[in-house]
Amino acid sequence: MADISPPEVYFTQTVPEQYTAALADAPANVAEQPELSAAYEITGPGGGTYALRVAGAQIEALPSEQLANPDMRVILSYDDWRSFAESDATDMLVDYIRRRKVGVVQGLKGTVHLELTRSDGSIWQSTMIFGGQAEPAVTLRMTNEDYGAMLSGELNGQMAFMTGKLKFEGSLPLLMQVGALSS
């Protein structure tokens, strides 16, 4: 488990280090994807708003006011952010780039609420707004373990739904589009 400092350190140092490491082993075409931007709103005491922009082999932390229309806005509580940051998981922006999903992210329009059940029964939550649009919206519910398996390709999203590992409420078309992030 990583020892994480404040969110500012995570977004200005940890995520850029993850990006550099991800590119080191990646095919050249990973860095040739279009520019991708993300804003992170960490709510509650200790939180703040942070912005990242990736262009080619460069990742840049920006003052949040300089990123008016990010491709992806992620909203989560300070406690849920800290839990994620301490898990040694790769930041989702870096993961989407590494897996060549920039075009998929940029094509999404709507809001995805994610509710993951941890092994201790507590719920980890985040909201991702794609393309600056609140609607359509979908809520996904599953275990943290199953979500990780789905993102890694070990668990097919359709199979997760058919076996009851993935439950959703809201827009089926948006759910189908979001499924492309896990393929």
Where are the regions that the model predicts?
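Feature captures hydrophobic
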Residues: 1-183
